[in-house]
Amino acid sequence: KSLYKPTISSMEGSKKGNNKFLLHNNLSEKGFPVFDTILASSLNDIPACIATLRNKGYKKAVVKSQIGASGIGITSLPTVPDGPISIPEHFFFEGPCMVQGWLDETVKNVRHMGSPSIQMFLDERTLSLYDITEQILNKDCVHEGNLSPPLYFSKNDWVFKELFRQATASGSWLHEQGYRGTASVDFLVVEHCGNIEVRVCEINARITGATYPSIIARHFLPHDAWLMRNIRFAKPLKDRSLLKILDQAG
């Protein structure tokens, strides 16, 4: 407002587009594979949700607020609690939370394959899917970078086609909410009982850590690979010091 410049997306479009619960419902209604999900209207509902997921064979569960980003509004819990369950009150600000089964090697016959993400841009008339990346995550699933392309499938594989099929559906839904701009769809790919399964985790209707490196790489190296890592220094560095280190390293 201070610059007297209009935004390309409405506030309502941004809010709806970042709502994980609305996206989950849309994908489920259209028959796409989704995570086992139970709604919790308050903290008192969480133990019963956790118990249900434990009976389904899950060792961990994740509690998601309807809107959140970069680790805000999401927390994981063991399905066998070792103490009282504590969830911040703001998790319920937008309405019921989603309590979902956590798919990884702790679940019988499941092997984690990867966490790909498809980058997209939405304008008034079109949805453009312009890159596919692999998220680099630490042991707590915190984002530490991206690489492209992912190493465990190629363009001719079923996984590649399924990722774009689900990304197209998710992006079309996002467009219907009125969102315009850059976005990405995050996925989980697992092997379950010998079959590969692809599920949408969430849509990030915003600029993400992969947006700029992806756009730059696709502009200058449209058919090549790229890698971006987030680095945190033990002591803060000034920009000149950082550039000097990079110059010295060649």
Give the ranges of each region predicted by the language model.
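Membrane-embedded hairpin module used as a gating/binding unit in multi-pass transport
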Residues: 111-154
